[in-house]
C-alpha cells in the first residue's frame, strides 16, 4: 500500500499545479490571447468587415444598377412604343399626304390634259376652218375660172351663134326679098 499511496501522491502532485507555473501559464495565455487578438483577430476582423462591406457595397450597387436598368429598360420600352406609335402616325400621315398629292397631281394632270385637248381642238378647228376657207376659196376660184371659161366659151358660142343666126336671118331676108322681088316681077 505504500506503493499505492506513493503512486497516488505522485499522481496528485502532478495534478496540483505550482502557483508560479500557473501564473506564468495564465500570463503567457493572456499574452498569447492579446497577441492573437491584436495581431490576428482584429486585422482579420477588419479585413472580413472590409470584405463584407465591399461585397455588400457591390451587392447594393448591383441591386441599385438592376433597379436603374429596369427603370431604363421600362423607359426605353416606353420610348420604343412611343417611337413605334410616332412611326405609325408618320406613316399614316405620309400615306395620306402622298395620296392627297397623287390626287392633286392627277387632277392637275387631268386639267392640264383637258386644257391641252381643248387648245388642240381649238387649233384643229382653226386649222380646219383655215383649210376649209382655203378649200372654199380654191373651189370658188376654180368655179370662177370654170365659169369664166364657160362664159368665154358661151360668149364665143353666142357670138358664133349670133353670127350664124344673123347670117341665117340675112339669108332668109334675102330669100324673102328675092321671092318678093320675083313675085313683084311676076305680077308686073
Curated annotation (Swiss-Prot):
Main subcellular location: membrane
CDD domains referenced in this protein's UniProt entry, alphabetically: ATP-synt_Fo_b
Keyword Membrane found: yes
Membrane topology, record value: Single-pass membrane protein
MF terms (GO), sorted A to Z: proton-transporting ATP synthase activity, rotational mechanism; proton-transporting ATPase activity, rotational mechanism
Signal peptide from the UniProt entry: none
Name the UniProt record assigns to this protein: ATP synthase subunit b
Organism field: Mesomycoplasma hyopneumoniae (strain 7448) (Mycoplasma hyopneumoniae)
Amino acid at each position: 500500500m505504500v506503493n499505492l499511496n506513493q503512486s497516488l501522491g505522485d499522481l496528485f502532485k502532478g495534478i496540483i499545479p505550482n502557483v508560479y507555473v500557473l501564473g506564468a501559464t495564465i500570463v503567457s495565455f493572456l499574452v498569447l490571447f492579446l497577441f492573437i487578438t491584436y495581431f490576428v483577430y482584429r486585422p482579420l476582423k477588419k479585413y472580413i468587415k472590409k470584405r463584407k462591406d465591399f461585397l455588400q457595397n457591390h451587392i447594393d450597387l448591383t441591386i441599385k444598377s438592376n433597379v436603374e436598368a429596369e427603370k431604363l429598360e421600362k423607359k426605353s420600352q416606353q420610348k420604343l412604343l412611343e417611337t413605334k406609335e410616332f412611326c405609325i402616325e408618320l406613316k399614316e400621315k405620309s400615306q395620306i399626304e402622298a395620296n392627297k398629292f397623287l390626287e392633286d397631281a392627277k387632277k392637275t394632270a387631268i386639267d392640264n390634259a383637258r386644257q391641252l385637248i381643248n387648245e388642240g381642238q381649238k387649233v384643229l378647228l382653226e386649222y380646219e376652218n383655215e383649210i376649209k376657207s382655203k378649200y372654199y376659196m380654191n373651189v370658188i376660184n376654180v368655179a370662177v375660172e370654170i365659169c369664166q371659161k364657160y362664159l368665154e366659151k358661151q360668149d364665143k358660142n353666142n357670138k358664133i351663134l349670133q353670127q350664124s343666126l344673123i347670117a341665117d336671118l340675112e339669108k332668109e331676108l334675102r330669100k324673102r326679098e328675092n321671092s318678093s322681088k320675083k313675085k313683084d316681077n311676076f305680077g308686073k
